[in-house]
Regions:
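Pre-NBD coupling/linker segments of ABC/ABC-like ATPases
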Residues: 2-44
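A short, surface-exposed alpha-helical micro-motif characterized by mixed small hydrophobic
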Residues: 212-214
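Conserved ABC ATPase "signature" C-loop
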Residues: 224-225
Length: 225
């Protein structure tokens, strides 16, 4: 059995703006008829290569707009690369955007089960993990609050707790560890150390270099793709 968890080979990702997919069919037809139709394209990532073995942690760094989040979306299967191939061996829990996978009008309790279900876990498993998730997120007093009533730090804590405590094969975090107060950042960093020692493969996008150096076994630097 292969020990490779993620293999990214010559991956390039192109965005196209101005076509009917991005502006809508009606606007596309109007622009075509009036001669005001231009298609622009840019490459968010170009010829990206990396290989990550099980139990390793990759840190992805780079300035804003360098293509970090786009690459993560391709690794998780949210979007397909324009060129190249990505092979993933294992289940993925991903925190790509704050609040993604949650319903603003549902309670913290309901959202915990919803998010867990989206990650593929059973009600029985989530029943067993629920109290631990809420304790780690420090949201014991907010279980019946609507998600939209939480602060950004609370939302991040809940998302991180669910992803880390359901034991995925691969954990992908986009700037999540930088949200929240200092005490929770330390606690989440300690949890990441525990996760890696337990054999989980992880990818972390972060602007905090000391955090990347401390946690990651490999680093990928992206510079405008």
């Amino acid at each position: 059995m292969s020990n490779i968890a993620i293999e990214c080979s010559n991956v390039s990702i192109r965005y196209v703006t101005g076509d009917f997919k991005s502006i809508g069919l009606k606007e596309y037809v109007i622009r075509k008829l009036t001669g005001n139709y231009k298609v622009k394209e840019f490459w968010a990532d170009q010829n990206v290569n990396f290989e990550l073995e099980k139990g390793e942690m990759l840190g992805i760094i780079g300035s804003n707009g360098a293509g970090k989040s786009t690459l993560l979306k391709a690794v998780t299967g949210i979007m397909l690369p324009t060129e190249g191939e990505i092979h993933v061996n294992g289940t993925i829990a991903a925190l790509l955007e704050l609040g993604s996978g949650f319903d603003n009008d549902m309670t913290v309790r309901e959202n915990t089960y919803l998010r867990g279900a989206l990650l593929g876990y059973t009600r029985k498993f989530l029943d067993e993990k629920y109290d631990e998730i809420i304790r780690f997120a420090e949201l014991e007093e907010f279980q019946d609050y609507c998600f939209k009533q939480l602060s950004s730090g609370m939302k991040s804590r809940l998302a991180f707790s669910i992803a880390c405590l359901v034991h995925p094969d691969i954990l992908i975090l986009d700037e999540v560890l930088s949200v929240g107060d200092g005490a929770f950042r330390k606690k989440s960093g300690d949890k990441m150390q525990e996760i890696i020692q337990g054999g989980v493969t992880a990818i972390l996008v972060s602007h905090v270099m000391p955090q990347v150096r401390e946690l990651c076994t490999k680093i990928l630097w992206l510079d405008h793709g």
